[in-house]
Amino acid sequence: MENQELIKQVTEKAEKWLTPAYDAETQAEVKRMLENPDKTELIECFYKDLEFGTGGLRGIMGAGSNRMNIYTVGAATQGLANYLNKCFKDKGQISVVVGHDCRNNSRKFAEISADIFSANGIKVYLFEDLRPTPEVSFAIRHLGCQSGINLTASHNPKEYNGYKAYWDDGAQVLAPHDTAIIDEVNKVTVEDIKFKGNKDLIQIIGEDIDEVYLDKVHALSIDPEVIKRQKDLSIVYTPLHGAGRVLIPASLKEWGFENVHCVPEQMVKSGDFPTVVSPNPENAEALSMAIELAKKIDADIVMASDPDADRVGMACKDDKGEWVLINGNQTCLLFLYYIIKNRIATGKMQPTDFIVKTIVTTELIKAVADKNKIEMIDCYTGFKWIAREIRLREGKQQYIGGGEESYGFLAEDFVRDKDAVSACSLLAEICAWAKDQGKTLYDILMDIYVEYGFSKETTVNVVKPGKLSL
C-alpha cells in the first residue's frame, strides 16, 4: 500500500514535466518512464528533489527532479543569482566565474549557468574549456568576483555530475550564506528560471588566467636547487581523462622537471572514463595503467589527479622495489613534513606560520608540528573548513600548508580549495629531495615513522544509492 501511494505521488510530480515549460527531449524521457510498467526508474527520478546542500548539487544525470539536468542546474543557478543580487545590490557590477570538468554535460551545464547569471544582470567569466577546480577558486579571487561555480562531480562514477558553489574568497560557501542560498534555490520554480542569456555580460577566459595561476604555483617551490640537481627525476602522471591533463604537466615542466611521462590513453578528455572502472585516485585500479608504465621505464613516482584535478593519488617503490600506493594520510604527512622541515632548513619559516588538517586526518601531523614548534589547527571534515581557518587568520598569520586524508592538499593561500596542480609539483619536489639524499619517498615515510611514531589506517566506503536501497 505504501508503495502504491509513492507511485501515485511520483506520477503526479512527473506529469508536471510534460508541460511546455520543459523541452521535448525531457518530456519524451519522462513519458517513457510513466509508460513503463516497472516504476523503479520513475520512483528514483522523482521521489524527491535533488537537494541543493551546503556544497551545492551532486547526482546522477537524467530527467527528473532527483537528477542532474538543465532544470535542476538552472534552479540552483537562478537561486544563487537571486541571492547575489540581494547580497551585493549596492556593490556595483556583480561578477562570477563559471568552470567545468570533463564530465558528460559539464560544458552544457556551464553554458546554461552562464546564460542564467547574465540574464540576471551578473557578469560571467566563463572558462573556454575544462579547468581544474583550484583554478576556478583562484580566478574568483584574481578577478575580484563575488561568487563562482564549477560543474563537476569530482571522482564519482561517470553517471554523475555536480555543481560546486564558491564565495568571494574562492572557498566553498559557508554560513550564513550557505543556508540563505539554499532558501533561495528552494523558492525557484521552472517558470522563474531565466534561460535567455545576455551575451554582452559573458566573457570567455582561459590562457590568460592559466599563465598567472601557474606563475603563482611555481613560486611555491621551496628548494629549486634540488630540482636542478634532480631534473631527470622520472615521473609518471595521469589525469584520468580529466581537467589536470594540460596544467599539471605544464606546472611540472615550469618547476624544472624534464622527464615527465603521461599515460597517453588517459590524456584523452572523456566523461566516459573508458580506461577505468571509477576515476578515483584513491583506488589501485585507477592507477594501474600508470603503474604499468612506471614499471616499464623504472620511474621514481606515479601521480594521478581526479577529473576536476583537486585531489591527487600517489604511488612509489617500497624497500623491496615493489610499487605501493601511498594513502591520503601518508601523502598529507609527507607533504606537510617536507614543507615544515625545509622551510626551517632554508630559513623561510616564520613564527606566524601555521598548518591545518581535518580532525579525521592522521595525528602524526600534529606530532611533526609540535616537535618543530609550528602551530597546527584541527578543523571539521571538508576543505571549506580549512579555507575558513585561512580566512580567519588573514593579515595576522601565514598559512603554509594543509590537507585531509581524502587526498586533498593545499600549499598556498591564493587558492581556497584543494589543489592537485600545486600538490603534484610539490610532491615531485619531495621525491627529488629524497633522491638527492639517495632515498625514495618510501624511505622518507619510514624515517618519519621512526622519528614521530607509526600509525596505520584504512577506509571503508559504504554506497547506498536511491530510495529503494535505503
Features from the language model and the residues they span:
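Conserved phosphate/anionic-ligand binding catalytic regions in large, soluble enzymes, centered on
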Residues: 46-66, 153-156, 235, 239-251, ...
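Active-site phosphate-binding/coordination module
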Residues: 135-191, 307, 405
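Phosphate-binding and adjacent anionic-ligand microenvironments
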Residues: 295, 299-301, 322-324, 342-470
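An N-terminal, well-structured beta->alpha segment
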Residues: 7, 11-113, 203-232, 243
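N-terminal small/polar loop signature for handling phosphorylated ligands or for N-terminal nucleophile
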Residues: 97-160, 258-314
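Glycine-rich phosphate-binding loop plus the immediately following alpha-helix
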Residues: 166-194, 329-353, 357-367, 420, ...
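Gly/Ser/Thr-enriched, mixed-charge loops and adjacent short helices
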Residues: 17, 21, 25, 41-45, ...
